[in-house]
Amino acid sequence: RIELTEEGQLFLGYAREALNQLAQGEEALKLLHCAPSGKLRVDAASPFVFHQLAPHLKAFNQAYPDIKLEITSHDNIIDLLEHKTDIAIRIGELADSNLHARTLGVSKLQLVASPDYLKTAPPLNELTDLASHQLIGFTDAPHLNHWPLTTPLDLKFSISASSGETVRQLCIQGHGITLLSEFMINEDLKAGRLVKVLEGEVLSPNRREKVHAVYYQNSGVSSRVLAFLDF
């Protein structure tokens, strides 16, 4: 990755602002005569796309037929301008002060396992019992392996994956216990593919629960972005 000099960083800031001003001017002209239209690029982690966005996209397309959606999936935080992204859905704490954010909601974390795993697993009555169990973690997001438990533990993971959706599938297939957001596993819990374990042992609220939509900070917001956020 190319690193900019101090002069380059300064120029980049002005260039970004100039592009934003041009985009705002174009948007203002569009708003005078027509409904929201054009390309809207939305980025979110794969599990959020599968379980939260996808079920609503058909209705959004019917409501705004002139908006062309482009959905991308990154499980790690991306630079919106670098990836030409209009909106990113982020779960957990926000750090980028150059972004506007709208809170979409809260998705609590749950410790879960498959019934098949629990049939042959050691007893699981308290948090310290986790030491004798297989745990499923994340490879590319170490902070997700620090579970916000009522009693802090040094957890050892038997298997890890880079994608939250892969972690979910590993859990369903009986590879161990994991900690996932409710939006990912609600249907699995209803269907009996997963069950909650050690209920009440996850701290709430915690820094990983909030779900935000973020977009680049400027003096105007495109009608496409507002249409998506308000839908």
What kind of feature is each model-predicted range?
Residues 11, 60, 228-231:
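Conserved hydrophobic/aromatic "anchor" residues
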Residues 37-100:
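Central regulatory/effector-binding core of bacterial HTH transcription factors
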Residues 39-43, 88, 136, 178, ...:
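Short, well-ordered beta-strand segments
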Residues 94-212:
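C-terminal regulatory
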Residues 199-231:
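A late-sequence structural motif
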